Amino acid sequence: MAALSIHHFRQAKQAGQPLVALTAADYATAQILDQAGIDLILVGDSLAMTHLGYTSTLPLTLEQMLHHAQAVRRGVERAFLVADLPFLTYQVHKEQALLSAGRLMKEAGVNGVKLEGGYPDMVETVAFLVQRGIPVLGHIGLTPQAKHQLGGYRQQGKTTPEAERLRQEALSLEQAGAFALVLEHMPAELAAQISAQVGIPTLGIGAGPACDGQILVTHDLLGLSERLPPFAKAYTNLRQAIREAVEAFADDVRQKVFPPR
């Protein structure tokens, strides 16, 4: 099966075909998602919380991201693979962003990178990367790396000035060359307006049904997270299933029925 290219995303938007994106941070999960036909797999900095036990995405380093992205790459044949640039690996200056993104593409084999924010300096950075051959997935609305400045994981764009700022950020990121945008935790009406205004696809996460596609953290979808964000949906409860399987194994061992005699 042919690997998806950057052109797939604009073509999907033009055809009205919803895009599906999920996160992965290990080989097995990546392989399963890829075989299920997911369009985009994101090695998200959320792995700092889901896989490494941190309370936010901020502690994640570029070396840790490289380690996980390399594992994911080995499991992906078809999906378009994007990795987050961790906090403070791209905000200092655009040359820093180029070095970080370049390492992820060169050493981990990702197809593109995701950057948070749409303020002027970040738009300039996006353009700088795109001009040098690096596909960029933009991310506006709730940007978790800025949680302290935002006052927590709060919905963004609820006021008229905030909504207008996000609309302008979306247009600016499109003009800078981003191939798609993540719209996170914003009013559905605003996300619908942005999705209609830009020519590139939008991937919603807590942004209503009018986006061109949806993205979720796979741990949330599988019921592995201890707490679900208000906009997520668990399609199964693997946390409970895993615990029950482990307890059943432990019981068999303690009762000396496994392995069978």
Swiss-Prot record:
Known pathway: Cofactor biosynthesis; (R)-pantothenate biosynthesis; (R)-pantoate from 3-methyl-2-oxobutanoate: step 1/2
Active-site residues, record numbering mapped to chain: E184
Catalysis: reaction(s): 3-methyl-2-oxobutanoate + (6R)-5,10-methylene-5,6,7,8-tetrahydrofolate + H2O = 2-dehydropantoate + (6S)-5,6,7,8-tetrahydrofolate
Cofactor annotation: Mg(2+)
CDD domains reported for this sequence: KPHMT-like
Subcellular location, record wording: Cytoplasm
Residues annotated as binding Mg(2+): D45, D84, E116
The entry's keywords: Cytoplasm, Magnesium, Metal-binding, Pantothenate biosynthesis, Transferase
Gene Ontology molecular function terms on file: 3-methyl-2-oxobutanoate hydroxymethyltransferase activity; magnesium ion binding
Gene Ontology cellular component terms for the protein in this record: cytoplasm
Any one GO BP annotation for this protein: pantothenate biosynthetic process
InterPro entries membership: Pantoate_hydroxy_MeTrfase (IPR003700), Pyrv/PenolPyrv_kinase-like_dom (IPR015813), Pyrv_kinase-like_dom_sf (IPR040442)
Major place of residence: cytoplasm
Binding, 3-methyl-2-oxobutanoate: D45, S46, D84, K114
Enzyme Commission numbers on file: 2.1.2.11
Cofactor note: Binds 1 Mg(2+) ion per subunit.
Oligomeric and partner information: Homodecamer; pentamer of dimers.
Protein function: Catalyzes the reversible reaction in which hydroxymethyl group from 5,10-methylenetetrahydrofolate is transferred onto alpha-ketoisovalerate to form ketopantoate.
Family: Belongs to the PanB family.
NCBIfam families in alphabetical order: panB, PRK00311.1
UniProt protein name: 3-methyl-2-oxobutanoate hydroxymethyltransferase
Organism classification: Bacteria, Bacillati, Cyanobacteriota, Cyanophyceae, Synechococcales
Gene: panB
